């Protein structure tokens, strides 16, 4: 297995929920998470939790919908950590539930900007920092946190389901280009079902049927520590406590 020790990993949306759980996992394994979040206070709170537990982390104000900000954050991280910056987790996501007749232009645009454009902006800038001319002992890692909603259908979720389906296809494109162009990077896809995070509060699901964020964070750590000759093309994680395909 590939060690996490000494690796710097940029995580979007790491100020709470799943992103925070991923950052804590990576830090506990010896990595240095760069906690990206549009909420400065939330990012600093995650860093403080990690440092209080004996790990290392740093905050970064990150608006994934702004390609200029994304470029600045990625370049600053690359300048600070050099070759040890070899991990990206596209975790930031948003959901503004509304039916087809009620969803506003602003709601639609906001969800697609975070869930679809954000991973593209971040992945593009991250891949541009990799020196493809030099051999690497281990490939870099990109984990796209998609959602089981990419392959399910739910009422009042047109924007979210559509954006996640688009991210699933983008992940396939990234995987194909990484292979055909010989990039020193692995692109992993992850489709979790409902987790007990603040974003799920609007759907009023029972806590008993949702997964703990740390369960999915463990899957992210697993992907990033696989031997260099393998990657996770697409991993669906579902709760056994909910029949069928929950949100």
What is the role of each PLM region?
Residues 99-100, 104-112:
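Substrate-binding pocket helix/loop in short-chain dehydrogenase/reductase
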Residues 147:
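Residue(s) in the substrate-gating loop at a strand-loop-helix junction
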Residues 8, 15-16:
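Conserved glycine-rich cofactor-binding loop
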Residues 40-41, 61-73, 105:
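The beta1-alpha1 cofactor-binding region of Rossmann-like NAD(H)/NADP(H)-dependent oxidoreductases
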Residues 185, 189-190, 205-245:
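C-terminal helical subdomain
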Residues 101, 152-158:
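Active-site loop immediately N-terminal to the catalytic Tyr-X3-Lys motif
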Residues 123, 163:
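Active-site helix of classical SDR
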């Amino acid at each position: 297995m590939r060690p996490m020790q000494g690796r710097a990993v940029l995580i979007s949306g790491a100020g709470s929920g799943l992103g925070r759980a991923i950052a804590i996992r990576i830090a506990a394994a010896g990595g240095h998470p760069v906690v990206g979040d549009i909420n400065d206070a939330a990012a600093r709170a995650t860093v403080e939790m990690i440092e209080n537990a004996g790990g290392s982390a740093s905050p970064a104000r990150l608006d994934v919908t702004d390609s200029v900000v994304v470029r600045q954050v990625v370049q600053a991280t690359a300048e600070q950590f050099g070759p040890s910056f070899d991990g990206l987790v596209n975790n930031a996501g948003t959901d503004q539930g509304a039916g087809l007749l009620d969803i506003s232009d602003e709601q639609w645009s906001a969800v697609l900007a975070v869930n679809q454009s954000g991973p593209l902006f971040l992945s593009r800038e991250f891949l541009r920092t990799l020196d493809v001319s030099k051999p690497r002992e281990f490939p870099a890692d990109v984990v796209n946190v998609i959602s089981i909603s990419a392959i399910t259908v739910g009422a009042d979720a047109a924007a979210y389901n559509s954006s996640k389906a688009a991210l699933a296809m983008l992940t396939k494109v990234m995987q194909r280009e990484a292979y055909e162009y010989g990039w020193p990077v692995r692109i992993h896809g992850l489709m979790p079902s409902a987790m007990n995070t603040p974003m799920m509060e609007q759907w009023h699901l029972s806590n008993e049927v949702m997964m703990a964020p740390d369960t999915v964070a463990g899957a992210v750590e697993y992907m990033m520590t696989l031997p260099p000759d393998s990657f996770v093309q697409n991993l669906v994680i579902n709760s056994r406590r909910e029949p069928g395909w929950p949100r």
